[in-house]
């Protein structure tokens, strides 16, 4: 299994200078993949990133970002959001990422109550609004369910399978699975054939393995369903105001951000 790390462990938003400083260290520690968030188009140059990663033997994964104002359901910003997602696919093609991963349905933090019929209508609208995005590229859209505090639309694998068009894949993130799924390994098996990307962290969003999560069962289920993509550490720094507020990171989650990555990598290699 290829192992990766998201640049959010250290910084946000990503810039060309940040990537030039981080990527050699990530490669030196032994990661296979570096995960690149596209917060705003133009934050970093994908062609420049592609050359840098190729020189270091690193692969890329790309994550989409859904701040307030990016929505595909019950919103007047659907067209702009579709344009943004298509841009993320173009970026992914340039850097060689097979997926764009993230909650491609609603702004993170946007929650509202829905009756069963209202939820069904929201899912139908989502399917319709994702079609032109999925049709845009061979890059696979990997949609991520989030926990109940960050969205009310897609919290579980079961909901995602109901809501999403067949051609959309899933991103599974241990942080959210641990909150919303009664049995994360069973959720993996339920998602068999649809899992396009996996993000990992400790259950406190810190270092993988320094928690009580049943890692052997989870990784065993991924093997059982023949998941072939990477496991990418996604965590966040408390030292960046934007990201600390967005992800509710109010204190350091490891002795250092480097330790979070290096110790997490060492643990993941044991699985």
Spans of features found by a protein language model:
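Arginine residue identity/basic-tract feature
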Residues: 25, 48, 58-59, 70, ...
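Structural motif corresponding to the early beta-alpha repeats
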Residues: 32, 36-127, 228, 232-242
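Active-site-proximal loop/turn and secondary-structure-junction residues that shape catalytic pockets
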Residues: 9-11, 38-40, 66-69, 104-108, ...
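Active-site acidic/histidine proton-transfer and metal-coordination neighborhood
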Residues: 75-169, 179, 251-259
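Histidine-acidic metal/acid-base catalytic patches
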Residues: 1-7, 11-27, 54, 96-98, ...
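Short Pro/Gly-enriched beta-strand edge/turn motifs at strand-loop
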Residues: 30-31, 142
């Amino acid at each position: 299994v290829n192992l990766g790390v998201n640049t959010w462990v250290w910084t946000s938003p990503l810039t060309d200078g940040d990537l030039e400083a981080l990527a050699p260290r990530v490669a030196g520690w032994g990661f296979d993949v570096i995960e690149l968030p596209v917060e705003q188009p133009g934050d970093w140059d994908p062609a420049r990133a592609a050359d840098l990663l190729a020189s270091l033997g690193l692969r890329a994964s790309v994550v989409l970002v859904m701040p307030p104002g990016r929505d595909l359901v019950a919103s007047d910003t659907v067209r702009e959001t579709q344009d943004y997602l298509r841009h993320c696919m173009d970026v992914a093609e340039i850097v060689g990422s097979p997926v764009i991963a993230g909650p491609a349905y609603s702004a993170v933090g946007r929650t509202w109550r829905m009756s069963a019929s209202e939820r069904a209508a929201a899912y139908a609208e989502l399917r319709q609004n994702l079609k032109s995005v999925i049709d845009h590229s061979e890059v696979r859209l990997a949609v991520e369910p989030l926990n109940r505090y960050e969205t009310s639309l897609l919290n579980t694998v079961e909901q995602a399978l109901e809501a999403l068009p067949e051609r959309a894949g899933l991103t599974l993130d241990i942080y959210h699975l641990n909150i919303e799924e009664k049995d994360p390994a069973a959720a993996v098996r339920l998602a068999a054939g649809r899992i396009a990307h996996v993000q990992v962290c400790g259950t406190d969003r810190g270092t993988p393995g320094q928690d009580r999560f049943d890692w052997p069962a989870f990784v065993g289920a991924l093997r059982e369903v023949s998941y072939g993509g990477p496991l990418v550490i996604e965590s966040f720094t408390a030292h960046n105001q934007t990201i600390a507020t967005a992800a509710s990171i109010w204190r350091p989650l490891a002795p250092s951000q480097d330790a979070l990555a290096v110790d997490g990598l060492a643990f993941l290699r044991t699985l």
